[in-house]
């Protein structure tokens, strides 16, 4: 598995060589940030520059090509002003799931009010509902179902925050805090993540009913 501390040190060094004082923020998201990484986990980097042009995207891409584990690198690249004007419901998850390496995202906090949390839950539930119905009727894909449960686990994090005021990053800890309906979602996600067998119809029906409930909340 990647030594993420050494890897991010090298990433920051290389990024600084390429973009210098234009760097506003660098962070780590995903399983490496949560301490839940496996051999196949992505390295989910967040980079916010003063601004981003097409040339910057090309330059960043060329920089990534020089780094080890290139095939595992993913993440988010943006200009500062775009981020500060981003949809607040997206920023709720973004802020709370990002581990700072350089700089701070605290300027986003003013945008993360109760309405943003409620909207994150609503939009997430609507997207899961649509994805679930579409998959049950057309693709009938176990891989899509796994992705929908992953998305649902993020919605559960927002629900937990709404109900308790706590943002819980680690899914196993989340499982101990949330209500029974949400426990089913998180438990199923963890089972699927660890390679558990898929009961397509039952899992789809459970996810459909759960998302339906939260759309109407």
Regions found by a protein language model. Name each.
Residues 21-29:
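Short, glycine- and small/hydrophobic-rich beta-strand elements in well-ordered beta-sheets
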Residues 1-17, 21, 33-39, 50-217:
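Catalytic core of pol beta-like nucleotidyltransferases
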Residues 46-48:
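Short hydrophobic/aromatic beta-strand micro-patches
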């Amino acid at each position: 598995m990647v030594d993420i501390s050494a890897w991010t040190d090298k990433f920051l060094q290389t990024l600084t060589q390429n973009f210098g004082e234009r760097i506003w923020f660098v962070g780590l998201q995903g399983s490496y940030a949560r301490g839940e990484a496996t051999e196949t986990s992505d390295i989910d980097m967040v980079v916010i520059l003063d601004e981003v042009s097409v040339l910057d995207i090309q330059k960043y891409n060329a920089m990534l090509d020089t780094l080890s584990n290139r095939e595992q690198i993913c993440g988010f690249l943006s200009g500062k002003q775009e981020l500060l004007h981003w949809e607040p419901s997206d920023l709720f998850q973004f802020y709370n799931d990002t581990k700072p390496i350089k700089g701070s995202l605290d300027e986003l906090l003013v945008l993360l009010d109760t309405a943003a949390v409620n909207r994150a839950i609503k939009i997430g539930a609507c997207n899961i509902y649509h994805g679930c119905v579409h998959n049950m009727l057309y693709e009938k894909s176990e891989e899509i179902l796994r992705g929908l449960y992953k998305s649902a686990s993020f919605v559960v994090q927002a629900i937990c925050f709404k109900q308790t005021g706590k943002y819980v990053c680690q899914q196993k800890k989340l499982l101990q805090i949330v209500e029974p309906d949400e426990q089913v979602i998180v438990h199923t996600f963890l089972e699927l993540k660890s390679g558990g067998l898929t009961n397509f119809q039952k899992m789809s029906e459970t996810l459909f009913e759960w998302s339906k409930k939260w759309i109407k909340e």
